[in-house]
């Protein structure tokens, strides 16, 4: 994620510069960011005092620990998804000061922003989400299952689009390749399918209570594959991260942000993921508790 996402994106963000990276294996630092100061841990990087803000893209089990270190140093912090290892740690993350931000980068897709603008805050809607793609990269340390690797973006997307909290989840399918979910919202419902496939598919459809199409997009595989090969192409991963990092800079300077999620958003997302696991085991609907 850092090598293929954040580092290319950072080069396009005005007023930002990569000054340090951390990894237990220093050779990886030198490969992805040659000439940049390298440290063996987030703690070493933070204690060196080289940075004005930090992106935490460590394994989820380390997110809370590293975010607390960054918070103690007063650093604006962006935590990659999943926000934490579980709901309890997500709640603790939301208590860190200054409040960390969360890398739900799908919010910065211009098509998603356009669709969200068409949905009134009190609307009852039905969302259909269908997102499949081949594996884009291989993590060094962790091998998250689909609920951890894909679930955070998709649950957040449902919440953010509809401005409505998730109340319960039913898992219709959960395999190593595909997840299918039915989601009940305070105002409406959603159907989500996501996972791995031989070709790309990115489709979102939003309808009102009468069944009328409000907005969405449908990007077939060949078009999406070509678009994402364009450096800085519209809605490429790097471009989504540019928007996210620009928001982080605004936040660091005390200015209003465009769409950046906070650690408070991470709590209901992790709660929905845990509910999906409960439902997968029971075959029944699972409630999503409210923690804030």
What do the predicted segments below correspond to?
Residues 1-33:
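N-terminal Rossmann-like dinucleotide-binding module
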Residues 61, 83-136:
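A contiguous active-site-proximal alpha/beta segment in oxidoreductase catalytic domains
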Residues 149-221, 243-255, 292:
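Contiguous beta-strand/loop segments that form the cofactor/metal-binding neighborhood of enzyme cores
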Residues 53-56, 250-292:
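C-terminal helix-rich "cap/oligomerization" subdomain common to oxidoreductases
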């Amino acid at each position: 994620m850092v090598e293929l996402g954040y580092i290319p994106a950072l080069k396009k963000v005005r007023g930002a510069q990569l000054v340090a990276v951390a990894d237990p294996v220093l050779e990886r630092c030198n490969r992805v960011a040659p000439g940049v100061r390298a440290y063996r841990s987030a703690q070493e990087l933070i204690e060196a005092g080289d940075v004005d803000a930090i992106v935490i893209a460590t394994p989820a089990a380390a997110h809370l620990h590293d975010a607390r270190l960054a918070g103690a140093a007063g650093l604006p912090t962006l935590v990659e998804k999943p926000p934490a290892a579980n709901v309890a740690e997500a709640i603790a993350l939301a208590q860190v000061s200054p409040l960390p931000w969360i890398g739900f980068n799908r919010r910065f897709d211009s098509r998603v922003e356009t669709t969200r603008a068409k949905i009134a805050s009190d609307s009852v809607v039905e969302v259909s989400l269908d997102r499949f793609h081949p594996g884009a990269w291989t993590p060094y340390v962790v091998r998250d299952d689909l609920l951890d690797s894909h679930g955070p973006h998709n649950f957040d997307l449902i919440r953010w689009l509809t401005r409505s909290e998730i109340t319960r989840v039913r898992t219709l399918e959960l395999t190593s390749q595909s997840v299918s979910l039915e989601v009940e919202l305070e105002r409406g419902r959603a159907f989500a399918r996501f996972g791995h496939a031989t070709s790309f598919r990115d489709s979102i459809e939003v309808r009102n209570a009468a069944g009328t199409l409000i907005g969405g997009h449908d990007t077939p595989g060949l078009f999406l594959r070509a678009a994402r090969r364009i450096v800085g192409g519209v809605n490429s991963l790097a471009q989504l991260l540019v928007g996210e990092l620009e928001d982080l800079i605004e936040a660091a300077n005390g200015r209003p942000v465009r769409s950046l999620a906070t650690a408070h958003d991470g709590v209901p997302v992790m709660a929905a993921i845990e509910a999906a696991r409960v439902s997968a085991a029971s075959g029944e609907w699972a409630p999503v508790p409210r923690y804030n």
